[in-house]
Amino acid sequence: MELGLSWVFLVAILEGVQCEVQLVESGGGLVQPGGSLRLSCAASGFTFSSYWMSWVRQAPGKGLEWVANIKQDGSEKYYVDSVKGRFTISRDNAKNSLYLQMNSLRAEDTAVYYCAR
């Protein structure tokens, strides 16, 4: 019985730690085709500089689509073909922040954008 209670307690602690991770996106808005937007993501609750980070998006009525990701030190970046040459992912480890500069926006870029660890 003691072992069972200890296990439940350990699970509760681990879940509590996981819940502290926060990724808060900002910078979205309405823009005409051809326009630009810069998205930001403020990270907390984990060592930001230790992780690859990504942007994903979900267009209305569709599933999640990976957009771009960036290595811990920013030295490697990858993009889905549809945004290459238009979107730029970047990060500032000193500010625990991730960015997505979106230029030459198209109607098909309409989506909810999320940052992901």
Curated annotation (Swiss-Prot):
The secretion signal range is: 1-19
Membrane-crossing residue ranges in chain numbering: none
Q: Which SMART domains does the protein's record reference?
A: IGv (SM00406)
Per the record, the GO terms for biological process are: immune response; immunoglobulin mediated immune response
> Annotated region Complementarity-determining-2: where?
70-77
| UniProt-annotated stretches for the region Complementarity-determining-3 | 116-117
Extract the ranges annotated as region (Framework-2): 53-69
Q: Which cysteines are joined by disulfide bonds?
A: 41-115
Protein location: Secreted; Cell membrane
Q: Where is this region: Framework-3?
A: 78-115
What InterPro entries does the record point to? Answer: Ig-like_dom, Ig-like_dom_sf, Ig-like_fold, Ig_V-set, IgHV
Under the heading Gene3D superfamilies, the entry gives: Immunoglobulins
Would the keyword Amino-acid biosynthesis turn up in this protein's UniProt record?
no
Complementarity-determining-1 as annotated region, ranges: 45-52
Start and end residues of each Ig-like domain = 20-117
Self-association and partners: Immunoglobulins are composed of two identical heavy chains and two identical light chains; disulfide-linked.
List the protein's name. Answer: Immunoglobulin heavy variable 3-7
Species the sequence originates in: Homo sapiens
